[in-house]
């Protein structure tokens, strides 16, 4: 009966499944297993291909490394990144804040690029939002961490924001998907993904032991559905409908920025990167001084690593006709997940031991 109910719900909500559906977390240093602040974004977007690139410092701006959509040759819209000063920023779209204006929309990437150029701290980011021309053209939960203890979300619409500091809540961390707690009650999206994330990490949240590995290797590869109460990656079904899991057909990256606790250590920031559809990707550590070439765009504007992962993703969603693209081939994906998790955990261990 439960399987039948789940199937009917999935069919009824197919259109909703196409909404951009990022899942994220801001973790203060005291809630982190490494004692360093964390910024996580599991990204969902209609732009299937993306890359990571460096922007050098200028006379009036900091240098930074960020995630971009393929085709963004001007590096105009940063979708997550960190700068030379130990500041990092990301966003999730929010669907229950004030309506967009008719004039300016989808400016979140521009705002984040500007923040990476100008901001050292969460307070700097607040000041930036205060001074930007209004309307800002954003409807977002911006997450930031810095090298001075800042870790916060800014639930932001065209004309203002509400700030939530992770260090001021009992757990020391905050989760956001595609609704804002300051917005319209029970509106927006991502309530099940929000619950998925919290349940998958319940023990570690309670213990204050969240790590980058837990976010990329457990949550971003999990097909746990909190409403149904099971993880479909652990089952035997071949075909599973893609709805309300953290990883989705629209997922294009999962990134954890592991920050630092002092500006003197800004060079030690690590951006743990699953580029492309996360269940099919292998982790790549990025530092300010070392951006692996496979993540950067080549002559065609695409990252070789992202293209490799997108090819694997196509095998996980092999049906093209009708509603076929909504079905995951779990027989293909289960061994891929297991192998990529094993390889990624080895990379985490090697980097933490040897710095590479």
Regions found by a protein language model. Name each.
Residues 86, 125, 255:
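A residue-level signal for conserved active-site and pocket-lining positions in enzyme catalytic cores
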Residues 127-143:
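Secretory/export targeting leaders with adjacent low-complexity proregions
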Residues 17-21:
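Boundary at the C-terminal end of the N-terminal hydrophobic targeting segment
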Residues 8-15:
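Bacterial N-terminal signal peptides
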Residues 84-85, 116-122:
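A short, structured loop/turn motif at beta-sheet edges
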């Amino acid at each position: 009966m439960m399987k039948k109910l789940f199937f009917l719900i999935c069919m009824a909500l197919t259109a909703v499944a196409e909404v951009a559906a990022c899942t994220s977390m801001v973790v203060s240093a005291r809630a982190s297993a490494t004692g360093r602040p964390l910024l996580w974004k599991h990204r969902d977007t209609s732009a299937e291909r993306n890359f990571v690139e460096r922007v050098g410092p200028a006379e009036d701006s900091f240098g930074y490394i960020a995630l971009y959509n393929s085709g963004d040759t001007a590096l105009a819209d940063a979708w997550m990144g960190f700068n030379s000063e130990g500041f990092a920023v990301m966003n999730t779209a929010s669907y229950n804040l004030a309506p967009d204006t008719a004039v300016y929309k989808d400016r979140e990437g521009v705002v984040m690029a500007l923040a990476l150029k100008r901001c050292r701290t969460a307070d700097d980011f607040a000041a930036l939002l205060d001074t930007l021309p209004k309307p800002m053209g954003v409807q977002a939960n911006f997450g930031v961490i810095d090298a001075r203890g800042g870790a916060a979300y800014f639930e932001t619409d065209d004309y203002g924001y509400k700030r939530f500091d992770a260090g001021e809540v009992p757990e020391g961390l905050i989760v956001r998907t595609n609704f804002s707690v300051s917005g319209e009650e029970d509106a927006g999206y991502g309530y099940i993904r929000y619950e998925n994330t919290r349940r998958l990490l319940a023990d570690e949240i309670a213990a204050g032991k969240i790590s980058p590995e837990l976010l990329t290797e457990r949550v971003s590869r999990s097909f746990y559905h909190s409403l149904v109460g099971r993880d479909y990656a652990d089952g035997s079904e071949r075909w599973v409908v893609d709805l309300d899991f953290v990883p989705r057909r629209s997922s294009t990256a999962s990134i954890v920025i592991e920050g630092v606790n002092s500006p003197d250590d800004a060079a030690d920031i690590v951006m743990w990167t699953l580029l492309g559809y996360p269940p099919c990707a292998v982790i790549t550590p990025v530092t300010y001084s070392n951006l692996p070439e496979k993540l950067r765009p080549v002559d065609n504007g695409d990252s070789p690593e992202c293209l490799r992962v997108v090819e694997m993703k196509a095998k996980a969603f092999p049906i093209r006709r009708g509603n076929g693209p909504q079905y995951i081939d779990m027989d293909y994906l289960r061994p891929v997940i297991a192998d990529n998790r094993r390889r990624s955990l080895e990379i985490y261990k090697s980097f933490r031991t040897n710095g590479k």
